[in-house]
Regions:
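A domain-start/cap signature at the N-terminus of enzymes
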Residues: 21-58, 137, 142, 154, ...
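Short beta-strand/loop motif that positions the catalytic acidic residue
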Residues: 174-177, 181
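Active-site machinery of serine-nucleophile hydrolases
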Residues: 55-58, 62-110
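Short alpha-helix in the alpha/beta-hydrolase fold that links the catalytic acid
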Residues: 73-75, 185-195
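Post-His helix in hydrolase/transferase enzymes
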Residues: 218-229
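Gly/Ser-rich "nucleophile elbow"/oxyanion-hole loop immediately N-terminal to the catalytic nucleophile
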Residues: 48-54, 102-133
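Primarily recognizes the serine-hydrolase "nucleophile elbow" in alpha/beta-hydrolase
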Residues: 116-119, 125-169
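Catalytic histidine neighborhood in serine/cysteine hydrolases
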Residues: 196-217
């Protein structure tokens, strides 16, 4: 229900306001080789995790092609992990797998999620997926394959490889793409929107074509508080699983993406 959504947003805002940067003890843990034949990944736990465990939301971040490989540190170059490094407070358990190359595999992503939830407590009704470029494809492929597991998904300048996109209509999905994207043309996202609308399966879909924005410009969304506000406004327990349409993202927001981030006084603990 909408009331429940805003309770979560109030809790999120309170957490952002109450954690002094100087007292942070958040942890970023590398998980290598723990899933046979699967992805290596990072797991981030926020500063207050010890007291919030079962109520902690989960964010799955899927990177683009430039971060593919076997060097897990590359996954920290942009996205939520880099936003945390810059000083953005994100009160969530963040899972960031590394794709060694090729398309993201929904089953392997799900294996990473399963492993993490078997080792870390979290709110399993509040699992979110966000990805950019190749990761935007991965976001839609994963959300469309496991729609009942994902509370909301945000796909940036990506597309979808699923032949059956029915699942994408079963959860709140926000697709964003720049009209000046020369790396992954906007048609990749438009095709998904058209397919869902054609099947009248777009009731939970949001899409925005950001005029004049390039491929890389959408990476700024990872640093914006609004991005996480929108994700956290949803839970799989919501009646009807309605997509929030009050939060907007504009070119002006992208321009100011870094302006209200307070630089960290201490680095996160990496292990």
């Amino acid at each position: 229900m909408r009331f429940t959504k805003y309770i979560y947003l109030i809790i999120y805002a309170y957490a952002c306001a109450c954690l002094p940067l100087g007292a942070q003890n958040d942890v970023l843990a590398a998980q290598k080789g723990v899933i046979k034949g699967g992805y290596d990944f990072w797991v981030y736990t926020p500063a207050d995790y010890e007291t919030t465990q079962d109520s902690t939301p989960v964010i799955l971040f899927l990177h683009g092609a430039s971060l593919c490989g076997r060097d897990l540190s590359r996954v920290r170059r942009y996205g939520p992990l880099h936003a945390l490094q810059m000083g953005r407070n994100i009160p969530a358990l963040i899972i960031a797998p590394q794709n060694p190359g090729g398309a993201w595999n929904p089953k392997k992503i799900n294996d990473v999620l399963d492993w993490t939830l078997s080792h870390y407590a979290a709110d399993t009704t509040r699992i979110y997926v966000i990805g950019m470029s190749l990761g935007g494809y991965g976001t839609m492929d994963y959300a469309g394959t496991y729609p009942h597991r994902v509370a909301a998904a945000m796909a940036l300048c990506g597309g979808c490889t699923l032949r059956d996109m029915q699942g994408l209509g079963e959860l709140p999905l926000w697709i964003l793409h720049g009209t000046a994207d020369r790396a992954v043309g906007i048609r990749h996202s438009q095709t998904v929107v058209e397919a869902l609308r054609r099947e009248k399966n777009d009731q939970r879909l949001r899409f925005d074509w950001l005029n004049g924005q390039s491929h890389g410009a959408l990476g700024r969304l990872f640093y914006m508080e609004k991005t996480y506000d929108w994700l956290f406004a949803h839970t799989v327990a919501d009646s009807g699983r309605v997509a929030d349409r009050l939060i907007t993202i504009t070119n002006a927001d992208l321009k100011q993406a870094y302006r209200n981030i307070t630089r960290r006084k201490e680095p996160m603990h990496v292990k």
